Each structure stands twice: as structure tokens, then as C-alpha cells.
Amino acid sequence: MSLYALLLVALGMSMDAFAVALAKGAAVRMPPRKIAATALVFGTVEAFMPLAGWVGGFYAKPFISEWDHWVAFVLLGGLGLKMMREGLSGEAEDVRESKQESLWMTVLTAFGTSIDSMIVGVGLAFMEVNIAFAAAVIGMAATVMVTIGLTAGKAFGVLFGRRAEFAGGLVLIAIGTWTLLSHLGLIQ
């Protein structure tokens, strides 16, 4: 696989994470340090998933391709509904939110946006590619795209407040629904 092709794959794999980061950045105020930490979590998970897929290879492919869209749909849909509910409630998020809960939600969201990367890893198992390098490139692309998404979302969120959280929830549900419908062959 050429470097150009790998960069395109990495960019494609990071687009779901970018959309989620844009929504999250609009909904929650994050200091630069938190943006960097969140981007690193997404990048790490996004880099790990193709490695896991590569290791699983063709043994996991039938199971993963059969259920990945349902997992993404449930995770992103559930997170989206939670964000919409919070956006409608009008209650400000508790600034003293538990660090463990915050980390858990970040990891869960990162996992939900990177399931397709695992399938890419399965495909990479059948190609001439340095999987460690490919995973690093995919992880770095996700880190950069999440940083951009959170930063751009932060500027957007200042303008639109709680409505942005509701819209962010809609984005998550749309991503999950699109993933499900495209895997079922109902849309392209």
C-alpha cells in the first residue's frame, strides 16, 4: 500500500471521530489541555483498532462484518440520545464531573467511532503493509482531526450553547444510523 493510499485511509477512518469531536466541542467547553487529552484518547483507540483487526485477520472477519454496524448504531445512538436529552434539559453540565466517568465516555465514544478501523485492519492483514506504521498513521490522523473538531466545535458552541449539544446528539445518531443503513445496503 502506498503512503498516499494509507493517508487517504487514515483520513477516511478519522472522519467519524472528527464529526463526533465537532459535536462534543460545541456542547462542552474544554480547556486546551482537555482537548489534547481527548484527541490522544481518540488517536490511541483509532490506532489500536486496526491492530486488533489485523491480528484477528480472516478468522474474525465474518463476525465483525456481520455485527459492526449494530454495535456502532447502538453506541452512537445511545450517546446521541443522552446528548439530546441533556441539550433539552437546559441544565448545565457539572463542571466537577468525575474524571473516570469523563474518561470512560471518551473511550466509549472513541470505540464507537473506530469500529470500522478494525475492519480496515482485517483487510490490511491481506495486503503488503507495515501494520505498525499504518496504525500509527491512522492514530495520528485521528488525533489531528479530533483536535481540529474539538477546537472548531468550541467556537461553534460559544455561539449556540445548549442547542449545539442537541444538534451534536443528532449528529451522533445520524452517524450511527448511516453506518447501520449503509452496511444493510439500504443507502450508499
UniProtKB/Swiss-Prot annotation:
Any one GO CC term of the record: plasma membrane
Keywords: Cell inner membrane, Cell membrane, Ion transport, Manganese, Membrane, Transmembrane, Transmembrane helix, Transport
Disulfide bond sites: none
Predominant subcellular localization, coarse grouping: membrane
Membrane topology annotation: Multi-pass membrane protein
Subcellular location: Cell inner membrane
Transmembrane residue ranges: 3-23, 35-55, 63-83, 104-126, 140-160, 167-187
Matches recorded under InterPro entries: Mntp/YtaF, Put_MntP
GO MF annotations in UniProt: manganese ion transmembrane transporter activity
Described function: Probably functions as a manganese efflux pump.
Family to which this protein belongs: Belongs to the MntP (TC 9.B.29) family.
HAMAP family noted in UniProt: MntP_pump
Protein known as: Putative manganese efflux pump MntP
Organism the protein comes from: Neisseria gonorrhoeae (strain ATCC 700825 / FA 1090)
Name of the encoding gene: mntP
